[in-house]
């Protein structure tokens, strides 16, 4: 789990996302509160529940990007889901409990990586012995002389192996077969039976080992993973993963505005209000049955986001509104924001295009006037047509760089300067003509 302070988290987010300080501060505090809660004594810790967040803002202002970056910073089980992918229990489609099952799978993978790192040294030693056995098979009759000769030879080969002198030599080794497993499609409400059937097939064991011929460098890598997997206790792994989900899990639900009820409808609203009703127990706290065990959702942090262009937060059912107490409004982007997006973030758009063209031997230089004009063009198109936020920059940049990208392979050694004149020559007609910009930009 991340031990970064809120200020450090915001600083990391600033490297990738321009503006939106309120949203950054809210998620930073929420993430830090996970750490603070774990410092309390057990009795009080159980009473402290996470304050779930609802992020509200137009499309393309950074809601999803904040989630993506937060996932890397959290160092905890994290899953991002689209609210529109789910339907009410009892109808065809994914039910919301699948969110917790997927989150638990993520935790299992995360915990397995941590546990395998802990026993990596022992795994490397075991893998080394298996490679040496393939290079120098142990004698069947273990006479003293043979044993001494073999031991000295093994030490010589061990030294060469560690120095990388044998990396390209080919050997034949037995590689463990994959775990036997069967994916079972089940109707809603039958997940428990499905999990039991999957466990039954998994208990049948692994497929038999196969003898393969490969280079020592590749063989060592596979054998280390295989030996590390043997050293990890699977039951302990599941217990730790479930504990990790329950205490540190984070769920990001995108497009939650798309499941708001719109006007009066006849018949059951299974993909909107029905999904909201199913989300209630998850957000409030319930127990979900997964193939790894029972998972309590009481202390999982939920962050929801939506543009709310065709609806408003009050269109969510009141019970769900009450379970998302922290509201954060993200601001629409201005032309000056677009300019900063083009230059300031790590691996900015201009930096990406410069690096891509450099692979063809073409030098690209973006002047300040050129960047100003690109930002202004993107903002103008957003104002005149549909406002899609920073995503408009991708469309404008791709259109601007189209000719250079096509001809770059034939113009190695050339240099192009993207200034205001170049931008005007390539984009002015499209930006000024509303019909063209609507269909092309």
From Swiss-Prot:
What is the name of this protein?
ATP-dependent protease ATPase subunit HslU
Answer whether the UniProt record assigns the keyword Chaperone to this protein: yes
The lineage's top-level taxon is: Bacteria
| Residue numbers binding ATP | 18, 60-65, 254, 319, 391
Q: NCBIfam families of this UniProt entry? A: hslU, PRK05201.1
Q: Region (Disordered) spans which residues?
A: 137-156
- A single GO BP annotation from the record? protein unfolding
- Entry keywords, A to Z: ATP-binding, Chaperone, Cytoplasm, Nucleotide-binding, Stress response
Q: Name one Pfam family in it.
A: AAA
